[in-house]
Amino acid sequence: IDELYEIYKDKGITKVVGIESRGFILGGALAARLGAGFVMARKPGKLPAETIEETYDKEYGTDTIQIHKDAIGKDDVVLLHDDLLATGETMAATYRLVERCGAKQAFVNFVIELKGSGRTQSIPANVEVTTLLQL
């Protein structure tokens, strides 16, 4: 948490989006440390209020990710967090949700990046992406 805090403490983060489910662990702790709100990105049917969703391709099919419709506003600076970057498709879909909500700016963080993961094909090139460890 300390290392992530040092990276993002001066970025003006107002919301941290943790991606189901391992992104909740450090994402929630990081949101608390940054003094930001925490938003869960979850699979369909798990959030209690009205949601928006994005469907994305996986290696063997498709999947869908949702956030609450009112979780992010136009003045928010958002950090999207997940534990592992493999294909990047889940993160890319979550990033599109944050864009649709009108966030002012978004950053992306993974704890671990698998080398040769294809990040450039799935997450827009202009998005600042950080990882703590590459394998």
Regions found by a protein language model. Name each.
Residues I1-L135:
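PRPP-associated nucleotide enzymes
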